């Protein structure tokens, strides 16, 4: 079975073809980097127009990569939320039009579910498992009991991790997107040079907060008269270290909540998995620290490959396959900007 996946929820136009044997036959991503760079962030209207321009080319390139045509396609899956509504509508309607023309099923996919299930495209891990989903717009600890069966154990009460990275990069005039730039500079800096607040780490539960950290970084930057390359590297290292320490601290509580929740609702596996996914999970320092923590608590730390952590259509196609296999889909779905995984 061959499934086309379409992803357009933010600033990357992506189309992929994945089959039911867990093979990525084609995977095309068209970046909108140059369109948004002058604004140091994503402009929704510009993003939607770029998706409209890029989708037809991306589809043609995907079919060329796969060396197949539309008659070999069985199902169309497209991100239908959450995210920037303009881009979501463009991608979802594009997918529905193709499905209608081919007489094939259309599956509306939750973007976050794509991140949650992406690890199973490569690892084929069993349910249940714990996910730390860290991206530009979301930061959540999620108990994954099965396809469409999710419990949010904790989440950010204000800003997402990726947003904090981008904001810090803007303050330092480093460019966009901020995550990869800060990670690179942090490797050259001293992570203990500047002390930054470990927000909410003393509280129970596993909710998170990054607004205080953003404010502290802003105050630190404005207090330094000359931002030399060494100083910038030290700020990046201290910021990244603090983010990771916050996530590690809250992960310990998340593991305890996950085990408690599963013991009441599900038979937990002998081998437990702690998955980190989402765009920020491409950060190798964060990934390794989470793996180390998972191992300490008897879990196997896993993550999708870096190219499946950032927004991509292969994870959307795979989520479509998972939903099709579970018979959990409806072609009649209205795209939405907000859509919790607990509503699936």
Curated annotation (Swiss-Prot):
Its cofactor is Fe(2+). Disulfide bonds: none annotated. Keywords: Acyltransferase, Cytoplasm, Iron, Metal-binding, Transferase, tRNA processing. This is tRNA N6-adenosine threonylcarbamoyltransferase. Belongs to the KAE1 / TsaD family. It holds the Pfam family TsaD. Signal peptide: none annotated. Its EC number is 2.3.1.234. Binds 1 Fe(2+) ion per subunit. The lineage of its organism: Bacteria, Pseudomonadati, Pseudomonadota, Alphaproteobacteria, Rickettsiales. Required for the formation of a threonylcarbamoyl group on adenosine at position 37 (t(6)A37) in tRNAs that read codons beginning with adenine. Is involved in the transfer of the threonylcarbamoyl moiety of threonylcarbamoyl-AMP (TC-AMP) to the N6 group of A37, together with TsaE and TsaB. TsaD likely plays a direct catalytic role in this reaction. Substrate binds at residues 133-137, 166, 179, 283.
């Amino acid at each position: 079975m061959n499934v086309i996946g379409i992803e357009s929820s933010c600033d990357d136009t992506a189309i992929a073809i994945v089959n039911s044997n867990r093979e990525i036959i084609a995977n095309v991503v068209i970046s909108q980097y140059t369109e948004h760079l002058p604004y140091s962030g994503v402009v929704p209207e510009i993003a939607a127009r770029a998706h409209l321009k890029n989708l037809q080319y991306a589809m043609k390139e995907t079919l060329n990569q796969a060396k197949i045509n539309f008659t070999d396609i069985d199902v169309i899956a497209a991100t239908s939320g959450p995210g920037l509504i303009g881009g979501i509508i463009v991608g979802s309607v594009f997918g529905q039009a193709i499905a209608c023309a081919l007489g094939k099923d259309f599956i509306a996919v939750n973007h976050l579910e794509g991140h949650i299930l992406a690890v199973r495209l490569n690892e084929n891990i069993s349910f249940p498992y714990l996910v730390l989903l860290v991206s530009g717009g979301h930061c959540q600890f999620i108990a994954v009991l099965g396809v469409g069966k999710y419990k949010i154990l904790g989440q950010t009460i204000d800003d997402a991790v990726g947003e904090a990275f981008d904001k810090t990069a803007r303050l330092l005039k480093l460019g966009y997107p901020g995550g990869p730039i800060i990670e690179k500079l942090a490797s050259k800096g001293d992570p203990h040079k500047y002390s930054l607040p470990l927000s909410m780490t003393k509280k129970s539960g596993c909710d998170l907060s990054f607004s205080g950290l953003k404010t502290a970084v802003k105050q630190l930057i404005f207090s330094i008269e000359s931002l030399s390359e060494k100083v910038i590297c030290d700020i990046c290292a201290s910021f990244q270290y603090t983010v990771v320490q916050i996530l590690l601290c809250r992960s310990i509580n998340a593991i305890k909540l996950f085990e408690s929740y599963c013991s009441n609702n599900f038979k937990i596996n002998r081998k437990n998995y702690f998955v980190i996914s989402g765009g920020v999970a491409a950060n190798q320092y964060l990934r390794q620290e989470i793996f180390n923590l998972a191992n300490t608590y008897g879990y196997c730390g896993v993550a999708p490959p870096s190219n499946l952590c950032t927004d991509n259509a292969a994870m959307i196609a795979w989520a479509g396959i998972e939903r099709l296999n579970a018979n959990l889909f409806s072609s009649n779905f209205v795209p939405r900007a907000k859509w919790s995984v607990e509503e699936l």
